[in-house]
């Protein structure tokens, strides 16, 4: 039986990755500061450990693993990343985790390790036009990320690639673009735009009002979590290092995203634009390289992903006692 370890297995993407590896027949160890919030872990062994401590990293890397997935990081959506209040923690905590995990894997002579970077490492100056952002993998330099989160991701990419060159490690680097889906954070201040808008619309009665940061014309692409997991595993099993974008090319404005969710929810709410942290004006995955190197790209539409995500968040909102009264019968009947 093959063995894998998933660091960050208590998080959104990590918990889904554990499930996928288990379906393939792997024995899986999950590691995180916490268990998954919304469902029991599928891991065979789950270790609560702070990977900022090198002793803990050596403890969890206590045997040969066929695949190591390093997704653990201090991160969140725009409300966490772009306020400036969390910059020191973001850089310090995530950098320590990556330094420690690479050293632990190197000492154990584990060769194959996957690192989840982010599209936030792309230069801000290439993403000022909401209709024509540039995120080709070779556009990363000259470097100019729009946040300390992006700078840390860029540093850690180089760290993994350096360990690959100098220590013969078979590293894989993916740049994630706005992953969403069920069992993701939806209300703790770290949620990303799809979850935040699903929550706001679920909480608001028909004809009510929600807030959107900025003018809503800023653009993004969003990738459903199952496709993210599939792309990550495919990259891990390939003979190519990356870095490569794992994201959707279906770009949408935040206003249009809200409209799409309203359609799925079967309600109309008004939008009030307010000041708030925004990030770049436009971002979209460029999938030319992943098509060339892996012969694969995500195929699920944003609408289909949201159609699976909104009902899950609606149920969470109802169970938390935050939904308007008319939402409860709809959730019970599945409409």
PLM feature segments, named:
Residues 20, 203-335:
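C-terminal substrate-binding subdomain of Rossmann-fold SDR/epimerase-dehydratase oxidoreductases
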């Amino acid at each position: 039986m093959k063995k894998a370890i998933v660091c960050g297995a208590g998080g959104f993407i990590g918990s889904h990755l554990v499930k996928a590896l288990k379906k393939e027949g792997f024995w899986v160890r999950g590691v995180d500061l916490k268990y998954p919030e919304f469902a029991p872990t599928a891991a065979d062994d789950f270790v609560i450990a702070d990977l900022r401590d090198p002793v803990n990293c050596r403890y969890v890397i206590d045997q040969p693993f066929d695949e190591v997935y390093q997704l653990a990081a201090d991160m969140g959506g725009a409300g966490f990343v772009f306020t400036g209040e969390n910059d020191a923690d973001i850089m310090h905590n995530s950098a320590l985790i990556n330094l420690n995990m690479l050293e632990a894997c190197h000492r154990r002579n584990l060769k194959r390790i996957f690192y989840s970077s982010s599209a936030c490492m792309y230069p801000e100056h290439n993403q000022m036009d909401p209709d024509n952002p540039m995120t080709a993998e070779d556009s990363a330099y000259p470097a100019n990320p729009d946040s300390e989160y992006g700078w840390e991701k860029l540093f850690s990419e180089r760290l993994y690639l350096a360990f690959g060159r100098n220590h013969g490690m078979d590293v894989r680097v993916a740049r994630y673009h706005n992953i969403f889906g069920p069992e993701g954070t939806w209300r703790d201040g770290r949620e990303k735009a799809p979850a935040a808008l699903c929550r706001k619309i679920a909480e608001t009665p028909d004809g009510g009002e929600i807030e959107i940061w900025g003018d809503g014309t800023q653009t993004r692409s969003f990738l459903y979590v199952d496709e993210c997991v599939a792309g990550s595993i495919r990259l891990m099993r390939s003979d190519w290092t990356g870095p490569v974008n794992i994201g959707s090319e279906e770009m949408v404005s935040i206003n249009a995203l809200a409209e799409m969710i309203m359609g799925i929810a079967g309600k109309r709410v008004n939008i009030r634009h307010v000041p708030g942290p925004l990030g770049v004006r436009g971002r979209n995955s460029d999938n030319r390289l992943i098509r060339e190197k892996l012969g694969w790209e995500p195929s699920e539409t944003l609408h289909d992903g949201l159609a699976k995500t909104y009902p899950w968040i609606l149920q969470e909102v109802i169970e938390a006692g935050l939904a308007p009264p008319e939402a409860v019968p709809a959730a019970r009947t599945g409409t």
